[in-house]
Amino acid sequence: MSNYETSQTSDLKELINKLRDTQTLSKNEWIRLIDGRTPELADYLFENAREVQITHYGHDVYVRGLIEFTNYCRNDCYYCGIRKSNLNAHRYRLTKEEILNCCKTGYELGFRTFVLQGGEDGWFTVPRLADIVSDIHKNWPDCAITLSVGEMEHDAYQTLFDAGADRYLLRHETYNDAHYRKLHPVSLSARHRQNCLWDLKSIGYQIGTGFMVGAPFQTTENLTDDMLFLKELNPHMVGIGPFIPHHDTQFASEPAGTLELTLYLLGLILSLIHI
């Protein structure tokens, strides 16, 4: 390794230390840390992230009961296999009784968090969803209820919260508006999705967000914007994952996101946000 490379690695390690200690980096520092990653730097990051994880979260693993209750969706996101224009998707939706039976089985198995996740299915109106949430809350009051059902207006989120929902998962996908428009139809906007997250947080939900890694057209600057948004929002949960091309979308031939970059970003996020 040359003296220049040694110096650069040392500088980037100092940025990792700064992130760990202050949870703050400038945009330029984020870009340097992402673009300058090496196996050696990743090992140093993971060592630091592991210390943060043990200090703040210990070694506990929490198991969630995920109920995928519908794959109908009104949206047409270009990367998604359940987009409304995919006529090859086998559609289904669970009944209220089937959802409650899933909760009953899960409770008997020891689950104490239920996650209701689905596409933005117009059949499940806010009153219908609120009725289901209310029954889950009444039958299993010691369980947390998490929703992941997409974008709504403030009043709808409030109704579901009042019915007993505790948490809400809504990945922002990408913060940058221009990048967002390349992945979604004009009926959807990055700003509206971000506003949904602010609404959810103001109501009192524990919120989770996140983004795709290696999505088509994604740049380091886009990832940096995502990191700065996470810092500003300070969510309770963050979930990221590599972009996986779906065969029934226009991105079918695009390369998948990498595990290497996903794990590296997870290490950075763990150092950035620890509740």
Residue positions per predicted region:
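Catalytic cores of alpha/beta
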Residues: 154-160, 216-230
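N-terminal pre-triad scaffold of radical SAM enzymes
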Residues: 44-86, 91-115, 166
